[in-house]
Amino acid sequence: MGVVTKKILILGSTGSIGTQALDVIADNSDKFEVVGIAAGGSQPDLVISQAQQLGLAADKVAVADAQAAAVVSKALGGEIISGTDAAKILVETTKADTVLNALVGSLGLAATLATLESGAHLALANKESLVAGGEFVTSKAKLGQIIPVDSEHSAMAQCLRSGTRDEVARIVLTASGGPFRGWTREKMWEVTPEQAAAHPTWAMGQMNTLNSATLINKGLELIEATLLFETDADLIDVTVHPQSIIHSMITFTDGATIAQASPPSMKLPIALALDWPHRVPKAQPALDFTAAHTWTFEPVDDAAFPAVQLARHVAKQKGTYPAVYNAANEEAAEAFLRGRIKFPQIVDVVDEVLQGASQFAGVASHVDDILATESEARARANALINRLATNL
């Protein structure tokens, strides 16, 4: 019997995760076949190139931005899917074994829900959709349907195979510390968007790089871990590991700790998610243990980087509180990039919006509840940003 290729749908094909996924698939064409791509539209020429190289029909290409979609449609000689729901529609109209959701931000929520509804495996790089959707999203998933792409959660999933659920004592989530590790809060008032865009060990998109600089990204990952692995936030430790070699660890009840180690590259977790639970040979180079290595670990400076402790509180609140955390951050991060607020004020905005969240956040029984909570959080965040901006 011949090898059966998996049909893969890639959402966010022009981003860092999407382009690396296409590289993995190109190197393993006997295992995978791309049946559709979706993108926001900031790089229409790249979408055109990808579609042509993959031999995709126009109706298997989705672009959210209308102007970019028109450019892509003309180049491909047919009408592509366009609009804010383009990725969701592509999922609903394309038969796939696995959907890689690498869209940026909570805009990926609709596509995540559509994937779960379709029955396809969800290779989830868009952590924001899980954080925003919370238990509403996980309640829609079949056992094992969501496969994490984040290197940390991929590492957790791999380490968890070393024991049973009741043998897990603690989860250890590692963080690089970002470009401002060791800085005081006072020093960070002078941080520029250009400085925040320079990550010491990972190559990521603009928003993920900024979220890593504030450690909001680690907060999102803590919340994500509670949802993916159905564990309490207090059982998750966060440690700063600047070398980004150990991606996460699991400590078991007998005192053993299992760690997943590999060079900082997303190709391994991407490949593993696409073919889970099987490993893809030579997904990336392995560590050379005959060479000298120094790995260090240190606690998070919560005074300088309060985002992690804030996320721990949010994870305990459950319901739509994580959606508030994410939505307020998206607005504050964008305001910082536009020069409207200072770097430390990003998390300050998130914190203040959360303090009033009891007035509008709660349990979500429908996706509209999540969207309404997000909308209110964004409105409150922007009102606060407007006040802060006038004082700069």
Swiss-Prot record:
One of its GO terms (biological process) is isopentenyl diphosphate biosynthetic process, methylerythritol 4-phosphate pathway involved in terpenoid biosynthetic process. It comes from Corynebacterium glutamicum (strain R). The lineage of its organism: Bacteria, Bacillati, Actinomycetota, Actinomycetes, Mycobacteriales. The gene is dxr. Its cofactor is Mg(2+); Mn(2+). Pathway: Isoprenoid biosynthesis; isopentenyl diphosphate biosynthesis via DXP pathway; isopentenyl diphosphate from 1-deoxy-D-xylulose 5-phosphate: step 1/6. InterPro entries: DXP_reductoisomerase (IPR003821), DXP_reductoisomerase_C (IPR013644), DXP_reductoisomerase_N (IPR013512), DXPR_C (IPR026877), DXPR_C_sf (IPR036169), NAD(P)-bd_dom_sf (IPR036291). It catalyses: 2-C-methyl-D-erythritol 4-phosphate + NADP(+) = 1-deoxy-D-xylulose 5-phosphate + NADPH + H(+). This is 1-deoxy-D-xylulose 5-phosphate reductoisomerase. Keywords: Isoprene biosynthesis, Manganese, Metal-binding, NADP, Oxidoreductase. Disulfide bonds: none annotated.
